[in-house]
Structures are given as C-alpha cells and as structure tokens.
Amino acid sequence: MWISLCIGFLGLCSVLIGSCILFLHWKKNLQREERAQQWVEVMRAATFTYSPLLYWINKRRYHGMNVAINTGPPPAVTKTEPEDQNSDSLWELDLSEGRNFVVQDSSPRGEASDLLQHVLGIPKQPQSSKMSQPRTDSPFPLPIFQEVPFALSLCHLPPMLNHSVSYPLANRPERNVPFCSLPTLAHGTNCFNAKPFALEL
C-alpha cells in the first residue's frame, strides 16, 4: 500500500511540474508575441531615415568631441566686450579639444603616411599647414580633416613581376630567383640557388 501511495505521489508531482513548465512556456510565448506586436506598431508609426551627417555628429560626440551642425552665421546682436571674450575663450577651448582628438585619432595614420611618403620619395609637408584652421564667429568648432598623401597612379607603376606582386618603386631591382611551386617543394627538390639569393641580400 505504501508503494502505491509513493508511486501516486510521484505521478502527481510530475504532473504538477509538467503543467508548470507548459504554463511558463505559454506565458513566455505570449510576452514575445506582445513585444513583436509593439515593435511592428512602432515601425509602422515612425519613419526612419539614414542621415550620414547625424551619424558623424553622434560618433564624434560619443568620443568626446563637441561637434554640431553649423547653420550659418548667427543673427546680428549687439554684444558687450566681456561676452565676446568669453565666446572667444570657449571657441579656443573647443577647437583645442577637437585638435587633440584629431591628433590622437590620426597618429597611426600619420605614421603610415610618413612611411608611404618615404617609399614614394614625396617631400613631407609641415604639420602647421595641415593643422591650420581659420577662426570664424561660429560658437561650434569646425571639423578638421587629414588629407590623404599623394600616391602614384596605377598606370605609372612597373608591370607585374613573375610570381610576385607589383613593386611600388619606379626603379625595381632585378630578381633572378627561380619560382618553386608547392608540388615541387613537396617532392623535396631544392630549386633555390644560394648564389643569386646572396647577391640580392
């Protein structure tokens, strides 16, 4: 008799647990459908337009740069001399923050551009000409862009070398190294000649 009672109690517990699991799944699916319906209503009611300028401004503000849309010169209002000095100090502070941000952001690009200028033989431009920024009467700092260094056109580059990439210099060295394919190397054939390779080094 005790065995039958234990079996009945275990069966009742399993039924209760199964019903609770089914109820939780039903409630979860119901909440998911409600959220999906709310999202559909929001998507139908709102109009989403992609604005590159707004994306650019939000990205700069996220990184700590004070940037806004410059709608033109402010209306002519008589200002006293202390107000003009305060606006000039705020302008210089914002401009210095923007310049610091640009310098920190473009430090790896500057190293890459210096290396490219050294390889291509282009004279390096002074930093003062790049970072020069005219002052205006706008209270918002103007964005500063780094110009890409001049690169040679692809039509002036030398032709493709045998089994190699195109050489970026005008005077390409003469290479006399034989090409070894993977099947040749798999067979263990040493196709490299030590003498021409040593001459290149």
Swiss-Prot record:
Keywords: Membrane, Transmembrane, Transmembrane helix. Signal peptide: none annotated. The chain crosses the membrane at residues 3-23. Its main location: membrane. It is a single-pass membrane protein. Disulfide bonds: none annotated. It is found in: Membrane. PANTHER family: TESTIS-EXPRESSED PROTEIN 38. This is Testis-expressed protein 38. It comes from Mus musculus.
